Amino acid sequence: MVVGGTGGKAGDPKGYFYPLGFTFVSKMFARVTFLPSLAYNCAMERVSARQWWDRIEPRVILGAIPFRSDWMALNLGMNMTTEQMVEMEGVRGVVSMNEDYELQLMGMQQEAWKKLGVKFLQLENTDIFSAPTQAKLRTGVDFMKEVVESGSSVYVHCKAGRTRSATLVAAYLMAEQGLGPEEAVARMREARPHILLHSPQWAALKEFHKGVNQQNRERIS
């Protein structure tokens, strides 16, 4: 399932605003830097304490992109195949914040996940300069909640598992545990210290938090 396009585009009242034309530039920058930055992430996994994925909650996993190729998975950071990860971690749902080209290059797409018995949701978002729209955050949180309540684990990823996917997991923590944006990010960093959010992601989380608070007030009244 693919929902919408890229969040944070100019004129989107639910995204972080940038001048017209910036979206195109940011998309091109993300494409050009995709492979170099992925190589950096693979190297950091080998020379530092970083893990390819970390459990943020008992049934919520935040991580980097699962590779389609067994060779890449075994040699570039995952240290096991994606199929092995699914079985070992009990993953039955995956949310990808990647754009199509990222998954087409080396990631797992819907049919590949289906063969492993895993539900898949793609919420496309450009890396670094944009944040998921509020609609995408709500859709992602609902999907995560459904998987968790079924007793299985959900794996949320982007390229490195530190910005786009971290934004969604933070929204989930706010919705399910009543945390504020700063508290949610601090909770994630306890398990995954290299999480990195920029102004657009913080703005999206603050907007989402307002929505959660409004819903809570409406339930009480």
Regions found by a protein language model. Give the residues of each.
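Non-catalytic regulatory/accessory regions that flank a structured catalytic core
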Residues: M1-P58, K210-S221
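Cysteine-based protein phosphatase catalytic domain of the PTP/DSP
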Residues: A43-V156, A171-N216
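Conserved G/P- and acidic residue-centered "switch" motifs that form tight phosphate/ATP-binding loops
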Residues: G161
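Hydrolases whose catalytic domains are alpha/beta-hydrolase-1, hotdog thioesterase
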Residues: R164, L168-Y172
